[in-house]
Amino acid sequence: MFTESMLFLLLFLLLGLIAKNNSLIIAVAVVILLKLFHVDGKAMEMIQAKGINWGVTIITVAILIPIATGQIGFKDLIDSFKSAAGWIGLGAGIAVSILAKKGVGYMAVDPQVTVSLVFGTILAVVLFRGIAAGPVIAAGIAYMAMQLVAFIK
């Protein structure tokens, strides 16, 4: 029962409780329950492989709700391009999307970086009340940094 992985998860649960971070608490609790109920490796692999896409889908649904309810319309879209903040937001959205795409690919080819990214994200969630949306984008930033290092060499 108290394997290294379970102790690691319990540590993250404790950190989530200390930081009062419900997202981290729920995520760790779900993973602990999956382990306690002996969910097989294939199911865990599927969740690991598809979980980010599921999360992105849920976030996208939440973002689209104001459009569906009429809170945001075409006028708002047009008005957003009349300000510097609107253009900066557009550029930031494009940049983050590209970084996330590169990050997913980089995490697949360099699993070593994944451990550091996950730990860094957990630390940011606990210490700075960050949001755990960072690993994919962080991997994209790491990818770009590694490309720069390779270019300089």
UniProtKB/Swiss-Prot annotation:
Membrane topology: Multi-pass membrane protein
This protein's UniProt keywords: Cell membrane, Membrane, Transmembrane, Transmembrane helix
Main location: membrane
A Gene Ontology term for the protein's cellular component: plasma membrane
One Pfam family it belongs to: DUF441
Compartments, record wording: Cell membrane
InterPro entries: UPF0756_TM
Transmembrane segments: 6-26, 54-74, 80-100, 117-137
Keyword Cell membrane applies: yes
Record bears the keyword Transmembrane helix: yes
Family assignment from sequence similarity: Belongs to the UPF0756 family.
Protein name listed in UniProt: UPF0756 membrane protein LMHCC_1001
Naturally occurring in which organism (per UniProt): Listeria monocytogenes serotype 4a (strain HCC23)
Lineage, highest ranks first: Bacteria, Bacillati, Bacillota, Bacilli, Bacillales
